[in-house]
Structure formats: C-alpha cells, structure tokens
Amino acid sequence: MNFRNEKDFEDLLVAMLPTVGWEDSVLENYDEARLLQNWADILFENNRGIDRLNDFPLTNGEMQQILEQVKELKTPLRLNGFINGGSVQIRRDNPEDTLHFGKEISLKIYNRKEIAAGQSRYQIARQPRFSVKSKILNDGRGDVLLLINGMPVIHIELKRSGVPVSQACNQIQKYAAEGCFTGLFSLVQVFVAMNPEEALYFANPGPEGKFNPDYYFHWADFHNEPINMWDKFTRDLLSIPMAHQLIGFYTVADDSDGILKVMRSYQYQAANAISDKVSKARWEAEHLGANQRGGFVWHTTGSGKTMTSFKSAQLIASSKDADKVVFLMDRIELGTQSLKEYRGFAEENEDVQATENTSVLAGKLKSNAPADTLIVTSIQKMSNIRNEGEYGLNAADLEKMRSKRIVFIVDECHRSTFG
C-alpha cells in the first residue's frame, strides 16, 4: 500500500494497534501533565486496597514525588530497573487517607509476568506533545506513543512512502537533542522508526548517550527472514503480548558500560526457544535417561552469544522451570570474562555466583538459596564432582545435587571436549 501523506499512514497504524492488543480509546494530543494524570488514574485503580491507597486518589504532590524519582534516575538504563522493579514508594500527603497520612507506602507500577492479564493496561497516545529545552523552539509533537500501565515505553516515528526510514531515525534524534525525552518521557525504553516498507527498532540511548545506527535493528522471524512491511512488523513486535515482553524481558540494562540494550530478533528467538525447551523437559526419574535433546545457540562471532545465553538463563530462572542454571566455560579466563559480563547484565535483585574452587561449586549446587540459582564455573571444576569422598562430598551431598533440576549452558561448546 502506498501512502502519499504521513497522516494516512498514522491513521492506519493507530487503527491497527487495537486489533493486536492495545486499547481502543486513543489519547489525542496529550502533554506531559495530562499523561501524568492518566498515570495517576491507573495507579489508583491498580492500588486501591487498604494496604496501599486505601481508596483515596493520588494527589498532585504524590505524583510529583514519583516524577522526581524518575527525573533523578534520568537514564534509560536506570529507569529500566525502575520499571521492572515493579513498585515505587511514596509518602502519603492526602489528608483524607488518615490510615497512611505521612507514612510511606508502596505502589505497584508494572509486573512483567502479567502479560495481557491481571491489571496490565495498554494505551495508545497519538501526537503526544513534548516540551523542549530551548525557549526559541516550538514544542514538539511525536507521532505515536505506546504506554503500559500509564508509562510511555515505546515511541514511534513515521514517514510516508518514498521517504527513507533514516529520516524517522533522524527525527527521533532531533527530538532527543531538543530535550523532548525528559521527565515522564524519559521512561521511553525503545524507539521505532517506520515507513510503510521498512521498520527499525533500537534502545533509547538517553540524554547523554549516542545514537548509533549500528544498533538500529530490523526485526526477523524464527528463520531470520527480515520483516520489513509495517503491518507485519506491527503484528510481530508491537502486538500484545510481544511488546510487553520486549520491555519486561528482552531489554537488558548493561551495568558494565551503562547502556540500555534491546535484543536483536535472532537473540530473542534463541532465548525464547531455549526457555520453551526447558519448560517442556521431563525431570521425573524414569525420563532422565531418555533422549531429551538440548540445543545450540548458533550465532556468528561478535553477534551477542553471551547476552543470549544470559537472557536464556534469566528466563529459565524466572520461570522456575529449573533449580540451577550453570554456565560452563572451558578456560579460566573465559569464565572470568563471562562472569563480569553476566554480572553486568544481571538485575539488582539477581546474583550470578562465581566458583573459586570445586568445593565452592559443590556448595552452590547443593544450596536451596535463590541467590545460588545462576552459577558460572569451569568444565574442569564440574568434572571433579564425581566421587564420594572427594572434596568433602558424601553420598547425601551427591544425592542432593542429583535431585536438583540443573540446566547447563556450555560456552564454545563446539570445541569443548574435556570431561
């Protein structure tokens, strides 16, 4: 379909989004103040209970407390932790709530596991109005903004047929330079640049970050066939549940370099397939000797295998489909490097455990502590855990380890022959 003007394209996109899981009602021309009130209304509906808002709405002062926390965090990386942390604390200043007045309460803002369920809300804001830093510039208007539970998390810029998608990327970059993605709009995690024949998506680099076209990605299907047409792209990536999962599971706040990352389509396909495989595993004793095949993460050099393997492990751990996920390395230096990367990818409430020696590894494999779920070790250390009496292990220890549901992710498995 050929679009001679951008408005026709925008009309059709906005009409299509409700067919893939977004709400029918569209927020037209909302500025930050109106979007903040919309967020307040959703927070109230999702937190009316006696232990939270006690059926008394949020005041402007309480919403400003939340907005100040957003402004203080500032970067998309830290705000990713805010969103996926699931809750926010405020001090009640609504005098009508005599039970909580002057006290701190916790409000639920988002649950990445409540996908198209529970209290999740999916809204479309059309032509959102941005305030710019400079007094001599007019305030900006975006094309389409997608909100989850009132938070703007995906911003879309459109261009008509015949206009390169790079111009939509440039428009996003221009808005960022003018200070449009600050305040409430700094919650945006992912940008989408789209014309009818091509679409790109990329992580928000933040106010001090750099827009790098090397990290503007095309989406692709399971067979890595590119999905360029706007309608197929919308159905695949911007639909619910996928958009919810993209924000909750397939963005990575990398503390090692301070940059928010979004996974490429092949990384998503691999991590999702691995997690799905583990969810269908049969752990009963009669099935353990059966031919339950695993799989390979088949990426080229430099294409993000480490992130894919970590995200696979994180998904498995989050789903509780295994008790332990063990990253096996065939060289000590690889283990040290990978441990650093995995810890960079890990969220604030996640631990990635090192194993200084075989005894430490054995202790973590026996442990029931949630902090000991993700473990990095070497094939050499793992191969040492075989016999009773070695490394202080007794029959009960070995049996305890055997009773665990353990998933192994082997780095460079094509060349790992030891053990």
Residue ranges and their predicted role:
Residues 332, 354-364, 379-384:
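Conserved helicase motor
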Residues 374-412, 416-419:
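Conserved RecA-like ASCE ATPase "motif II neighborhood" in helicase/translocase motors
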Residues 312, 341, 357, 361-364, ...:
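Short beta-alpha junctions and helix-cap segments that line functional grooves
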Residues 347-360, 409:
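Short, charged, low-hydrophobicity "junction" segments
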Residues 358-375, 400:
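Conserved motor-coupling elements within RecA-like helicase/translocase cores
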Residues 1-324, 329, 333, 337-349, ...:
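ATP-dependent helicase/translocase motor core
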